[in-house]
């Protein structure tokens, strides 16, 4: 089986990661103790991707949980699915990273990293044919960002040919947790460009907007945000967990979505958007789902796809529906909005259908887009970074942990390069190539 090893780090990573497991257990009919409640072949057919079968028929998530302080771990353990994880797979320190990337990457995190790698190795040895890793973390804090990227680079060294997928929560302009977020995010981004294969970009501001605007929640909690994220994560991974026709593993996903190796930051969207505990009264049609999921208001990160162009995209539908109708709708979107797709990658939207809908819905769709407009996020973080880095504000917290200013400068220029690469492909037209097909296509 093509197993995926799940790793969650830091407070944010552990919270969205645990929520993800609640959703996945539910979809595969596994109760909080790891016992199977369902007799359905579809649910159990590819159960080994995320679960290891232990003695007595218990299914244990292939999950590694790490943090530099015990708090979040304790709440995961006492949470609804706390008993399902392997107790040895909780690895935590006592000191915390104090929102300092350098503590996570160089000092506190570096002391704990070997024990994390031991558990990762043990889990990897349990796999027949490991296809890759997925990491949940945020980029604004210290542990998920600093130690998360340290772990990613160590795994990259040890398993160079396995896929590395991340669910990365970027800091948001309006919803700020700490003042040094731009530093932490830029230092992490620098690492993710080099060491990750595919990054699903999430951010709290976009999630808050969805809660306010679409779900009409007046005071959304992190629980509501995590509900949205876990729905999206479940949608992104459903083609890996259930039998399906298209995008059935992490590598196929990457091949379909990544035209240039550095441009692997994806926007994700989900439809229909529902709030926690609500009942869906009306089944949406395939055209409605398609329209909703391409809507810029449905994107889980604060960048507007209308400000850029799609290099590639992938749409995953779930539920009983006709694949022909799905293909027609996707084609329809491309024809109607052709200026938002680069014309030099023909047929750049892939669609897939998985028969099992998520709990409580009869159909749903998940969207993954590689859009040049994601540069808005990097540009925003980089402006905040530069504003603080010029006067060297807060820098002593990082140099005090042994970091060099040079590393800041390198990270800054790597992120600026990334932004200009996105811009370059956004502006590129088919004309610039030296081919002549007799007709001469028109650029914009």
From Swiss-Prot:
GO terms for cellular component: cytoplasm; microtubule. One of its GO terms (molecular function) is structural constituent of cytoskeleton. The keyword Magnesium applies. Residues 422-444 are annotated as: Disordered. Its cofactor is Mg(2+). Its main location: cytoplasm. SMART domains: Tubulin, Tubulin_C. Found in areas of rapidly dividing tissues. InterPro entries: Beta-tubulin_BS, Beta_tubulin, Tub_FtsZ_C, Tubulin, Tubulin/FtsZ-like_C, Tubulin/FtsZ_2-layer-sand-dom, Tubulin/FtsZ_GTPase_sf, Tubulin_C. Keywords: Cytoplasm, Cytoskeleton, GTP-binding, Magnesium, Metal-binding, Microtubule, Nucleotide-binding. PROSITE patterns: TUBULIN, TUBULIN_B_AUTOREG. GO terms for biological process: microtubule-based process. GTP binds at residues 11, 69, 138, 142-144, 204, 226. It is found in: Cytoplasm, Cytoskeleton. Mg(2+) binds at residue 69. CDD domains: beta_tubulin. It comes from the Eukaryota. Residues 429-444 have a biased composition (Acidic residues). Tubulin is the major constituent of microtubules, a cylinder consisting of laterally associated linear protofilaments composed of alpha- and beta-tubulin heterodimers. Microtubules grow by the addition of GTP-tubulin dimers to the microtubule end, where a stabilizing cap forms. Below the cap, tubulin dimers are in GDP-bound state, owing to GTPase activity of alpha-tubulin. Dimer of alpha and beta chains. A typical microtubule is a hollow water-filled tube with an outer diameter of 25 nm and an inner diameter of 15 nM. Alpha-beta heterodimers associate head-to-tail to form protofilaments running lengthwise along the microtubule wall with the beta-tubulin subunit facing the microtubule plus end conferring a structural polarity. Microtubules usually have 13 protofilaments but different protofilament numbers can be found in some organisms and specialized cells. Belongs to the tubulin family. This is Tubulin beta-2 chain. The gene is TUBB2.
């Amino acid at each position: 089986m093509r197993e995926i090893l799940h790793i969650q780090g830091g407070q944010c990573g552990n919270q969205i990661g645990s929520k993800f497991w609640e959703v996945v257990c539910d979809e595969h009919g596994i109760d909080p103790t790891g016992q199977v409640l369902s007799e359905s072949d579809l649910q159990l057919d590819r159960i080994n991707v995320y679960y290891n079968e232990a003695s007595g028929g218990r299914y244990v998530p292939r999950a590694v949980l790490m943090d530099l302080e015990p708090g979040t771990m304790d709440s995961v353990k006492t949470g609804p699915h706390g008993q399902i994880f392997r107790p040895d797979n909780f690895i935590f320190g006592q000191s915390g990273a104090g929102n300092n990337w350098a503590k996570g990457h160089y000092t506190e995190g570096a002391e704990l990293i070997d024990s994390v790698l031991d558990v990762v190795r043990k889990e990897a040895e349990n796999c027949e044919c490991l296809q890759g890793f997925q990491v949940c973390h945020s980029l604004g804090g210290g542990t998920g960002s600093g130690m998360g990227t340290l772990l990613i680079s160590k795994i990259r060294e040890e398993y160079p040919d396995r896929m590395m997928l991340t669910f990365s929560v970027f800091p948001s302009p309006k919803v700020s947790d700490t003042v040094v977020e731009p530093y932490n995010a830029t230092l992490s981004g620098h690492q993710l460009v080099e060491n990750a294969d595919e990054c699903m970009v999430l951010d709290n501001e976009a999630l808050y907007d969805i809660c306010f605007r679409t779900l009409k929640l007046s005071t959304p909690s992190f629980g509501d945000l995590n509900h949205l994220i876990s729905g999206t994560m479940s949608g992104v991974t459903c083609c890996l967990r259930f039998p399906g026709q298209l995008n059935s593993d992490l590598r196929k996903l990457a091949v379909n979505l990544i035209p240039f190796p550095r441009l692997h930051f994806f926007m994700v969207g989900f439809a229909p958007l529902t709030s926690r505990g609500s009942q869906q009264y009306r089944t949406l049609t395939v055209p409605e789902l398609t329209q909703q999921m391409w809507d810029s208001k449905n994107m889980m990160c604060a960048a507007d796809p209308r400000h850029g162009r799609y290099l590639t995209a992938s749409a995953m539908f779930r539920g009983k529906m006709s694949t022909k109708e799905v293909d027609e709708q996707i084609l329809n979107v491309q024809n109607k909005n052709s200026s938002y797709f680069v014309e030099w990658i023909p047929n750049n939207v892939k669609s897939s259908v998985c028969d099992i809908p998520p709990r409580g819905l009869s159909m749903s769709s998940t969207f993954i887009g590689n859009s040049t407009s994601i540069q808005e996020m990097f540009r925003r973080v980089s402006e905040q970074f530069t504003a603080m880095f010029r006067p060297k504000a807060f820098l002593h917290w990082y140099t005090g942990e042994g970091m060099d200013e040079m590393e800041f400068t390198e990270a800054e220029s790597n992120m600026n390069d990334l932004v200009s690469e996105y811009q370059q492909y956004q502006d590129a037209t088919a004309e610039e190539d030296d081919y002549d097909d007799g007709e001469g296509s028109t650029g914009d």
